[in-house]
C-alpha cells in the first residue's frame, strides 16, 4: 500500500540467486558468503562481492565465478598469484567444488 503521504513505492522484482561462494575458515567453519548477482560473484582485495583487503596474495580484482548456460566457470582476472589450480582463462565448476585464491579457501554452492 501507499506510504503515509499516499506515495506508492515500486521496485524491480528480485532475481533469484543461482549459486553462492562460501569462504571456509579455520576449523572448516563457514565464513563470508557471497550470492550471485547477475550470475557472477567477483572475488578480490577490493571492489568485489567477496573482499579480502588484508590478503597480500590476493589481487585487487583476482577472479570471478560465473553461471553460463547451466555450468559454472571460474575465471582468473589476470591475478598475480593465480589460484590453487591455475586457471588460465576459465574452468567449469560444480556444486561442492573448492577454490583457493590468495590465502582464502572457498566452496561453490549451486542452489538452482
Feature-to-residue mapping (PLM):
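Intrinsically disordered, low-complexity acidic Ser/Thr-rich regulatory segments
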Residues: 1-54, 104-107, 111-112
Amino acid at each position: 500500500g501507499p506510504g503515509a503521504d499516499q506515495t506508492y513505492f515500486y521496485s524491480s522484482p528480485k532475481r533469484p540467486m543461482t549459486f553462492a561462494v562460501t569462504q571456509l575458515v579455520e576449523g572448516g567453519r563457514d565464513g563470508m558468503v557471497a550470492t550471485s548477482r547477475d550470475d557472477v560473484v567477483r572475488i578480490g582485495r577490493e571492489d568485489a562481492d567477496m573482499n579480502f583487503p588484508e590478503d597480500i596474495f590476493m589481487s585487487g580484482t583476482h577472479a570471478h565465478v560465473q553461471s553460463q548456460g547451466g555450468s559454472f566457470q571460474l575465471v582468473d582476472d589476470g591475478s598475480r598469484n593465480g589460484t590453487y589450480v591455475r586457471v588460465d582463462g576459465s574452468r567449469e565448476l560444480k556444486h561442492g567444488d573448492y577454490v583457493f585464491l590468495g590465502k582464502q579457501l572457498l566452496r561453490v554452492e549451486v542452489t538452482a
